[in-house]
Amino acid sequence: MLEIDGSFGEGGGQILRSSLALSSLTGKGFRIRGIRAKRKNPGLQPQHLTSVRVMKMLTNARVSGDYLGSTELEFEPGEVVEGSFTVDVGTAGSVSLIAMTAIPLMINRRISLRIRGGTDVPLSPPVDYMRLVFIPLLEKMGITGKIEVKRRGHYPEGGGEVEVYGFRGEPRDLVLDSFGELREITGVSHVTSLPAHIAKRQIQGVMEVLREFNVPVKVEEEVSNEGSRGTGIVLSAHGLSIMGASSLGEKGITAENVGRKAGTELLKELKTGAAVDSHMGDMLVTFSAFANLEYTGSLLTQHTETNIEVIRKFLEIDVKIEGRSPFKLRLKRK
């Protein structure tokens, strides 16, 4: 059984999620101590506990320590179980982070997941980022899949719902040296259970920032009265690769400034010339379990560095990193 130190590096929930994903793929059990040791509320919170229970369900795993607040966990995967499953975080915990844990195991298996929780919440990728940036980048390495939004869930109420299914393909090596020439910018500006004009005003804020680019900017408005109150905007820039940026509505922040924030973040990412943004630079790492990866990223975050160390625990892999902002990463199976 592999020993994982949950306090090393960024010391957050990603260490656990990556360990769960890789354990389920490789069949290697692990014991993790110091779960989320560097967070204000260490130990398993509802979102992390849901990730554990999803992977336990999908692998018929033997698990101990899976309770709220637990700082130690043992996980020994068994046989993969296919089928359709529904899980509910019970809070506004991120459905995207739970999906990220399960998707690697779902590839080329008849597994679909309906996840209830937060679709657009702070400190995690909005579900539209998963749809507009994450999945299109997976397609570049030969993997397709679907994430459908059934209902939006914002902090603190939650109550959102997504369906994750159809992940399949023949994974191939991924090489992304640069972003290349910008062709277009797409996105979604959403508002739920609040005045509809907010979605349009968020787009206006984006257009103010991105007007310097002489490319089509197509941001859809999504207005719904079903789901917990909130707003947000996600952008995706398309060239040889795909970069993303996002912003969530907040009390006291105008809709225009929500849009400007997302536009400014995207502009900052694009100016690095890297192939992927700072979030995808981290999220892609786990997929070195399927193929060799070589790409440039806008910023080498502590999240990314920590994730690489978890990968090294489970896989025999050569790692080469050059630079920090931007950086170049090579992950090659031995």
Swiss-Prot record:
Lineage: superkingdom: Archaea
The keyword Signal appears for this protein: no
Record field: catalytic activity: a 3'-end 3'-phospho-ribonucleotide-RNA + ATP = a 3'-end 2',3'-cyclophospho-ribonucleotide-RNA + AMP + diphosphate
Active-site residue list: 303
GO molecular function: ATP binding; RNA-3'-phosphate cyclase activity
Binding site for ATP: 279-282
GO BP: RNA processing
Known EC number: 6.5.1.4
Keyword field: ATP-binding, Cytoplasm, Ligase, Nucleotide-binding
Subcellular localization: Cytoplasm
One cellular component term from this protein's GO annotations in UniProt: cytoplasm
InterPro entries assigned to the protein according to its UniProt record, in alphabetical order: RNA3'-term_phos_cycl_insert, RNA3'_phos_cyclase_dom, RNA3'_phos_cyclase_dom_sf, RNA3'_term_phos_cyc, RNA3'_term_phos_cyc_type_1, RNA3'_term_phos_cycl-like_CS, RNA3'P_cycl/enolpyr_Trfase_a/b, RPTC_insert
Uppermost EC category: ligase
Functional summary from the UniProt entry: Catalyzes the conversion of 3'-phosphate to a 2',3'-cyclic phosphodiester at the end of RNA. The mechanism of action of the enzyme occurs in 3 steps: (A) adenylation of the enzyme by ATP; (B) transfer of adenylate to an RNA-N3'P to produce RNA-N3'PP5'A; (C) and attack of the adjacent 2'-hydroxyl on the 3'-phosphorus in the diester linkage to produce the cyclic end product. The biological role of this enzyme is unknown but it is likely to function in some aspects of cellular RNA processing.
PANTHER family: RNA 3' TERMINAL PHOSPHATE CYCLASE, RNA 3'-TERMINAL PHOSPHATE CYCLASE
Annotated HAMAP family: RTC (MF_00200)
UniProt similarity note: Belongs to the RNA 3'-terminal cyclase family. Type 1 subfamily.
Protein's UniProt name: RNA 3'-terminal phosphate cyclase
Species of the source: Metallosphaera sedula (strain ATCC 51363 / DSM 5348 / JCM 9185 / NBRC 15509 / TH2)
